[in-house]
Amino acid sequence: MPRERQKRGRRAEAKRKRDDEVGDRTAPKRQKASEGDNDFNPLHSQAKIGDDYIPLEEEPASSMDTPFYGLLDPDEQEYFSHASGLLELNQFETEEEKSIFIERVYEEADGKELKIACSQSCSRLMEKLISASTVSQIKSLFNKFVGQFLNLVQHRFASHCCESLFLRAAPYVTLEMKKNSAEKNDNECEDSSANLRLEDLFLAVLSELEGNWGYLLTERFASHTIRVLLLILAGEQLDNPSKATVIASRKKENLDKPKVTQRDKSASDRRAVPPSFNAALEKMMNDLVTGLDNTYLRALATHPVGNPVLQVLLSVELTHLGKSKARDPDSVFRRLVPDENLEEGSESAAFIKGLFYDPVGSRLLETMVQLAPGKFFKTFYKALVLERIGSLSRNEIAGHVVARILERLSKEDLKSSMDLILPEVLSLVKRSRFTVIKTLIERGVIRGVDLRPLADSLLLAFGTDPIARINNVLKLHHLNEENDDTKRSSKNSTPEQLHGSLLAQTMLKAPGPLSELIQSSLLAVTLETLIAIAKDPVASHVLQDALTLPTSTIQFRRQITSRFSGKMAELALDSSGSHVVDAVWSATENLIFIKQRFAEELLANERPLRDSFVGRAVWKNWSMDLYKRRRGHWIAVAKGLESVNPSNSENRQPPKSNLDLARARFAEKSNTSTPKKISATF
């Protein structure tokens, strides 16, 4: 007969009490080590926390409240892991073969979708399947998740599957709107789930999560899902790079998503959404903040989990619900900042001042600065920023907010702000905090502000010696230590090197003394230092911009390119230096003799270049095969007179001589004259 669990419970209770006593004695030491971030001793925390306290991690829910969907058996786990590997390799011969494989995986996963989504090893497979699924497959999977979303969005692994499902289904909602309601025949799947509308499925998700928004707002995993739903309902372009950090955290791996380097033109357009989404969006936003008082709402601004959700709420409110929404007393914006005048000592002014220096809250303040109505921004700038912009720019955190403020200033305000920031340039350079300086240069070029005072301040800060100046900007002493034929990577570079390189690139884009500061330094450094810059993955971008930007004169390009003589093959075989060699091609467009000399140097090293991956790219970009076989055509291409494409060169007509032009005029005159009638004799 089994024993009762009561006796074991008493032992566990006694042990728990002993552990608590030991914990109480060692609590001060733990607090000192962790600085009180993870100390949940109620006796110690009671005196510090207030009504606006939001714990970072709630106590885990009881196992009885969290449903368990079961585990995959070893054979199933092995099969799905193998399928995940095949999808990762993506070595299918045709798209039809891939679609058949995905259909087979779905058949094998029938009835096990929830197990796979909650599996640590197989949830990645679910994400990959979703990214390659058809509309009918998306609807079928969506329908099987309905009723379980409240639990799935809070799960560590299943929450990522939910996000992928929502992001994949969002574009099809727009397509469904454009289709005729009579078109219901789906050749891919005749299941009843194929006739479901994704619009209704999304509304079912909102209905399922309704009533739990207050808790999900600060839930570690569900908060990401809330952001995705808000953006989908608002019709935002989900492939916009600016939304990448809002949708997912920096730690999330982008599975099967192409990297977007620049913003697409279509990204600025809103997706068409059904009218029910607009109503659902307003209701969801109201439900998210209705039960929260102003104190709790402001506490979310500095909460690591709640802050990104608050950013999305604020951006959607100010961009999709109209600027007039900001005047509504019940709006998120007005509840955060109820005072319009922002007088000194007011509650709103104190709240905003605190956000300037908070590493989490400053991100919300950046969103407010970017999207706030013009009237509020002018009041905010004059009341809280104008007199303090110099001291704010010195701070590492507040400097990012200052950069956003500079982006909205007019020419006159930008000039006055620059005058207040100039005394702090020396301090900013010593601390390698170039964000404000970089933004000043960018906005000064756009607004047409005279940047010579800033150039003089940078000259004093970096040094009048051109060699020492480029060393201070790019931190070249680190390059000298690493210049030992060792593999370098941009991941190994320090933040100071990266920010210095970005500042130098920005200075090169400004015509006048700012670009001359960098150009003169590049001409003054030794050849070894110049080659080290060209081979560095971070600093080489400065050299590429110096060679290709319109601010570089032909005299500078002639002087800088001639220094690479004898080093072209060495640079062409380097992963970073090869990009500099490509930039030399563009820089020598009007310097054909220098370009020919470099081509001869590359031709002499043909075998090493062809054996190297980056070398083959340089060989192709310099059209060296054309240089070997058709030297005259290569010269025309080098001058920009002809295209490299042989088909274009064959269709190209050579210029007509004066004799050919005279013959053409005579032939045209003969055709326009009245033809003679010739009588035919029979």
UniProtKB/Swiss-Prot annotation:
Residue ranges of the region described as Disordered: 1-46, 249-272
SUPFAM superfamilies: ARM repeat
Example of a GO biological process term: endonucleolytic cleavage to generate mature 5'-end of SSU-rRNA from (SSU-rRNA, 5.8S rRNA, LSU-rRNA)
Primary site of residence: nucleus
Segments passing through the bilayer: none
Keyword Zinc set for record: no
Record's keyword annotation contains Chloroplast: no
Signal peptide extent: none
General function of this protein: RNA-binding nucleolar protein required for pre-rRNA processing. Involved in production of 18S rRNA and assembly of small ribosomal subunit.
Protein name: Nucleolar protein 9
Organism: Blastomyces gilchristii (strain SLH14081)
